[in-house]
Amino acid sequence: MSCNGCRVLRKGCSETCILRPCLQWIESAESQGHATVFVAKFFGRAGLMSFISSVPELQRPALFQSLLFEACGRTVNPVNGAVGMLWTRNWHVCQAAVETVLRGGTLRPISDLLESPSLMISCDESSEIWHQDVSRNQTHHCRFSTSRSTTEMKDSLVNRKRLKSDSDLDLQVNHGLTLTAPAVPVPFLPPSSFCKVVKGDRPGSPSEESVTTSCWENGMRGDNKQKRNKGEKKLLNLFV
């Protein structure tokens, strides 16, 4: 035999029905049907079955009761629901709405609850507390950012000092090396071919111009051998 919930929802019921244990706390069969229809209209049939199947079997009756109170509270007070009525000490209104639903009655929003000054004060207080928490978190974040930036600045200063000390040490080492080994001028030594001296006591010695030409010829002898391979003409001595 199908349970009262599956009967009003027009769905098949079995021995493993997940809706049957949720309605055991309601005494009459008609009240079980009214509660099931009201919750299913508010949350949707698929949503109701999804909520019930997502919790263990022992917690399903309490879940269905919570859904029923929340649906009645949102219908009577759409702004704050059952939690708002509990906060403003109007829980008896929510209980009366549940009893009305179990009897098969209809609910409508109550304007007195929406314009309740105590509810507005409570909302303002909660908003103020939330703003204080947000500002506190922002201050904490700013402190963390400041400390982090200070640490980064200190690290950069240390790195700069380290680089400066390394550069100073490098300059000192290079400066010391240049001072400890002073440069000694080295005389220029021409090749041996240019250092050959032609004495003038040799018989048949040529004139000064001839000696200069012969020295230049001896100095360029190596270059002429390379140029000869390239097809250039040999320099002739016209004063011999």
From Swiss-Prot:
InterPro entries: LOB. Belongs to the LOB domain-containing protein family. This is LOB domain-containing protein 39. Residues 1-107 form the LOB domain. It holds the Pfam family LOB. Residues 200-233 are annotated as: Disordered. Residues 207-216 have a biased composition (Polar residues). The gene is LBD39. It comes from Arabidopsis thaliana (Mouse-ear cress). Signal peptide: none annotated. The lineage of its organism: Eukaryota, Viridiplantae, Streptophyta, Embryophyta, Tracheophyta. Expressed in young shoots, roots, stems, leaves and flowers. It comes from the Eukaryota.
